[in-house]
Structure formats: structure tokens, C-alpha cells
């Protein structure tokens, strides 16, 4: 199936997804949006790993992507727990309001 679509298209899609993630990380002020942007960047890198792995007929990229997804799932659980705790304590998810150390 991937032989019908050039490899450059997958890498271009990966670059676009990564750029959207960076833009969301840099320009958004909501913690959940920033968190989702980081996850989008991770998935863009995973797409690149799988693309190169398929092109070179090796399994290493697929295995590495699997482990990255496992770690990302654990990171998502911990990150959402932290976000929930911050929201309970501060009643806001704006990064500028959460950054201040005073209560």
C-alpha cells in the first residue's frame, strides 16, 4: 500500500504535523492545548520513524515507535493528572496565571 504513495508525502505530512505542534506549543496559552501540541509532535516523529523503517525494510523503527507510544501513554496519564491538580488548586488553565508561584 505504501508503494503507491511516495515516501516524501509521508515525510511532508510528518513535517506539517510537527510544525503545527510547535506552533501550538509556542502560541497557545491553555495548558491542555499545549499538552495536545506536544502529543502531536510525538506522533509526527512516530510517523517519520515508521516511514523510514518501512523504506529500509527494517523493524527497528516500528519497535521504537511502539515504545514511544507506550511512554507517551504513561506521560499522558501523568500529565492529565497534573493538569487536573493545577485546575483544582488554581481554577484556571491559563499558563500565564499558573506560572506565578504566589497563591
Curated annotation (Swiss-Prot):
The keyword Chaperone does not apply. Its EC number is 7.1.1.-. Pfam families: Oxidored_q2. Keywords: Cell inner membrane, Cell membrane, Membrane, NAD, Quinone, Translocase, Transmembrane, Transmembrane helix, Transport, Ubiquinone. It is a multi-pass membrane protein. Its main location: membrane. The chain crosses the membrane at residues 7-27, 31-51, 63-83. It comes from the Bacteria. It is found in: Cell inner membrane. It catalyses: a quinone + NADH + 5 H(+)(in) = a quinol + NAD(+) + 4 H(+)(out). GO terms for molecular function: NADH:ubiquinone reductase (non-electrogenic) activity; quinone binding. NCBIfam families: PRK05715.1-2, PRK05715.1-3, PRK05715.1-5. HAMAP family: NDH1_NuoK (MF_01456). Belongs to the complex I subunit 4L family. PANTHER family: NADH DEHYDROGENASE SUBUNIT 4L-RELATED, NADH-UBIQUINONE OXIDOREDUCTASE SUBUNIT ND4L. NDH-1 shuttles electrons from NADH, via FMN and iron-sulfur (Fe-S) centers, to quinones in the respiratory chain. The immediate electron acceptor for the enzyme in this species is believed to be ubiquinone. Couples the redox reaction to proton translocation (for every two electrons transferred, four hydrogen ions are translocated across the cytoplasmic membrane), and thus conserves the redox energy in a proton gradient. NDH-1 is composed of 14 different subunits. Subunits NuoA, H, J, K, L, M, N constitute the membrane sector of the complex. This is NADH-quinone oxidoreductase subunit K 1. It comes from Solibacter usitatus (strain Ellin6076). The gene is nuoK1.
